[in-house]
Amino acid sequence: MKWLGESKNMVVNGRRNGGKLSNDHQQNQSKLQHTGKDTLKAGKNAVERRSNRCNGNSGFEGQSRYVPSSGMSAKELCENDDLATSLVLDPYLGFQTHKMNTSAFPSRSSRHFSKSDSFSHNNPVRFRPIKGRQEELKEVIERFKKDEHLEKAFKCLTSGEWARHYFLNKNKMQEKLFKEHVFIYLRMFATDSGFEILPCNRYSSEQNGAKIVATKEWKRNDKIELLVGCIAELSEIEENMLLRHGENDFSVMYSTRKNCAQLWLGPAAFINHDCRPNCKFVSTGRDTACVKALRDIEPGEEISCYYGDGFFGENNEFCECYTCERRGTGAFKSRVGLPAPAPVINSKYGLRETDKRLNRLKKLGDSSKNSDSQSVSSNTDADTTQEKNNATSNRKSSVGVKKNSKSRTLTRQSMSRIPASSNSTSSKLTHINNSRVPKKLKKPAKPLLSKIKLRNHCKRLEQKNASRKLEMGNLVLKEPKVVLYKNLPIKKDKEPEGPAQAAVASGCLTRHAAREHRQNPVRGAHSQGESSPCTYITRRSVRTRTNLKEASDIKLEPNTLNGYKSSVTEPCPDSGEQLQPAPVLQEEELAHETAQKGEAKCHKSDTGMSKKKSRQGKLVKQFAKIEESTPVHDSPGKDDAVPDLMGPHSDQGEHSGTVGVPVSYTDCAPSPVGCSVVTSDSFKTKDSFRTAKSKKKRRITRYDAQLILENNSGIPKLTLRRRHDSSSKTNDQENDGMNSSKISIKLSKDHDNDNNLYVAKLNNGFNSGSGSSSTKLKIQLKRDEENRGSYTEGLHENGVCCSDPLSLLESRMEVDDYSQYEEESTDDSSSSEGDEEEDDYDDDFEDDFIPLPPAKRLRLIVGKDSIDIDISSRRREDQSLRLNA
């Protein structure tokens, strides 16, 4: 398997099936060439006769179509190539490479042959002028690789006694042609050649083969100019006299353009065939050619060309190339009747064979036979990445990685929820590069062992506090499974022992904060007791992913705060903290705020968690009615946000009183002013809020969100309505209860049975009044079969009858109208559609997220427009988003 043999329309003679188009085809072609071209042939023959006289050649060479521009006939090319390879390549490789051995057939006038070269047909002569000088010749080649002196190397190669006898019968022109041919082979070893010749024993058709391997990176359309092919055209008589089928016809190609056979020799004759070649031959002159790269070639990659469709049998059925081995075709095809079935994802569609995929296959060590149909994208398991992040977080308090703020994928990154035992910022860190990979091809994330232990511990705590209830507006829900919206009155049967018992269970990094906050990232988050810290993510944290370190040794005194020298922060999903947007007034008296300001302290952990100073924000006057006197702390002068946390999953027994606190988290508006932290058990806010002073006043658009998961039509329904206070539509059902910058819903129980999990994360873009920006709505729902009675009871008290306790949740949503987003925005429907579509790829950031259960479509209603979203497929190419006006 060395070079071009017989093909249906390319070559004359083949190594294996040369019977079809051998002699008859040659005769027919020669007849076509001679008929109707007598005048041209006469002129050409005259030129040939003149050149033959000059060169001292006669015999059948005079019958050649014409002498090439180099003056080297086909027979001379064969002789020179055999001698050049014997001098240059054979000593270097350590074995004898392919030879034409045409000297066994002397011409009628054999004046230029030595006597030892004239043997019978049955005893072909091989060039062995360098017998006993292999080591010496190899040293010449090694020396040339260092100094690259062509003339010096040629003299050393032709310094033997054999050379005097060989050149005795050669004229000056023939000596020059031979010298140039040796130079062509010597240039293979130049440092700037970009390739090298190596032994190759892969193919069964040859014992001692060779291959050409790239030594540098070649780009597409680059010409490998030193990989030269020398061409000589063959007449019918020359073919019969010089070529022996299956022995030396490895480099004969038929030119359909010239309608003649061509002999190709030189360094390019060692290029092997591949059914997926990376190079092709291009002409560089009348009798020379070089190689052009069809695609990028890496160093160490073999350079290959395509020999033809029928070179290795019918349809190359005996081909032994790497591509046939990988595909299971050619000589590697299953010979047992039917072809071996290959695993196919979709019979109509398959991934193309690209170099990146094939190289990734080699690196990953995947099964090579599946590369034609299966994705070889590197899907890193969540646990692997998370464990690495945990190890990193034990050494560093925060690690910032600069991200491209204008990248649509990065701005839409959904920060994963931090489990209680982990401080990693993201369990899917590699998902940034794999956002286009379908979820069906991704490995499901497995929860860590420490996380399972925490869940079991939390479950035991919940059983002890099963009697605790939470009132959210008119909804009465049992167990901390429903998101609390900011400023909701919280009533519990038992008061916790103070804000000092606030502990962080896990961190939640919502997507809206990725684009809403451009402040400094949080360097430290502190918690009390053995619980893990809550990770707070600001707008800038999208580009600087923060790894937070455990601060289990930190103890908080009562009435003290965790100080954060950062901007407006993101609270945690499983903690009872409540953060209020900065443009909205906080629920504190200014005097009380000032009094408590002195008690605000920033704690540093033993491992050196650093706090980052933010710019000095303006003092925010905050007025609110406090129904019960509770310790609420804020330091608006220095700290942009001072959250005090109430963790429902505290690991200490004394903190078990906070288990009943429902899961809640809201987002803060991107104002560099302070956010108060509500740690009270029962807290009622004013219905009317005054806008606080900030750098830039922004008009706030408020929405009511209604989510119906299961109804008669079977399509989950999400309805958004503008509030009356945004000078738009009215919906007075929930004027008195809730006020938040956006809606974040997460319903979760325990994760012991993953089959019962229901997850829905939605990113919806809205255009606020000026149409200059968009924001996101994030909804996370997890189905749980337990405690359906309490959920249903709360929903019935709200006056709504639902078959499923998760079927209806109403809340309010605020959209801050400002133009700091890096992302383009369109009208409501198109923006919502884009966000929903992209959410199909971002919704598996959480460790315990699983693909959506049977629900096939989700209907999003914004005003008079609605969108039906197909949530059963993870493919971006699925054109399943339909806009219904």
UniProtKB/Swiss-Prot annotation:
It comes from Homo sapiens. Optimum pH is 8. Changing residue 229 to F: Km for H4K20me1rise to 17 uM. 8-fold decrease in catalytic efficiency. It catalyses: N(6)-methyl-L-lysyl(20)-[histone H4] + S-adenosyl-L-methionine = N(6),N(6)-dimethyl-L-lysyl(20)-[histone H4] + S-adenosyl-L-homocysteine + H(+); N(6),N(6)-dimethyl-L-lysyl(20)-[histone H4] + S-adenosyl-L-methionine = N(6),N(6),N(6)-trimethyl-L-lysyl(20)-[histone H4] + S-adenosyl-L-homocysteine + H(+); L-lysyl(20)-[histone H4] + S-adenosyl-L-methionine = N(6)-methyl-L-lysyl(20)-[histone H4] + S-adenosyl-L-homocysteine + H(+). Homodimer. Interacts with HP1 proteins CBX1, CBX3 and CBX5. Interacts with RB1 family proteins RB1, RBL1 and RBL2. Interacts (via C-terminus) with FRG1. Keywords: Chromatin regulator, Chromosome, Disease variant, Intellectual disability, Isopeptide bond, Metal-binding, Methyltransferase, Myogenesis, Nucleus, Repressor, S-adenosyl-L-methionine, Transcription, Transcription regulation, Transferase, Ubl conjugation, Zinc. This is Histone-lysine N-methyltransferase KMT5B. CDD domains: SET_KMT5B. Residues 193-308 form the SET domain. S-adenosyl-L-methionine binds at residues 98, 203-206, 210, 257, 272-273, 320. Residues 1-62, 363-444, 590-655, 716-740, 816-850 are annotated as: Disordered. GO terms for molecular function: chromatin binding; histone H4 methyltransferase activity; histone H4K20 methyltransferase activity; histone H4K20 monomethyltransferase activity; histone H4K20me methyltransferase activity; histone methyltransferase activity; metal ion binding; S-adenosyl-L-methionine binding. InterPro entries: Hist-Lys_N-MTase_N (IPR041938), KMT5B_SET (IPR044424), SET_dom (IPR001214), SET_dom_sf (IPR046341), Suv4-20/Set9 (IPR039977), Suv4-20_animal (IPR025790). Changing residue 264 to S: In MRD51; uncertain significance. Residues 367-378, 393-402 have a biased composition (Low complexity). It is linked to Intellectual developmental disorder, autosomal dominant 51: A disorder characterized by significantly below average general intellectual functioning associated with impairments in adaptive behavior and manifested during the developmental period. Its EC number is 2.1.1.362, 2.1.1.361.
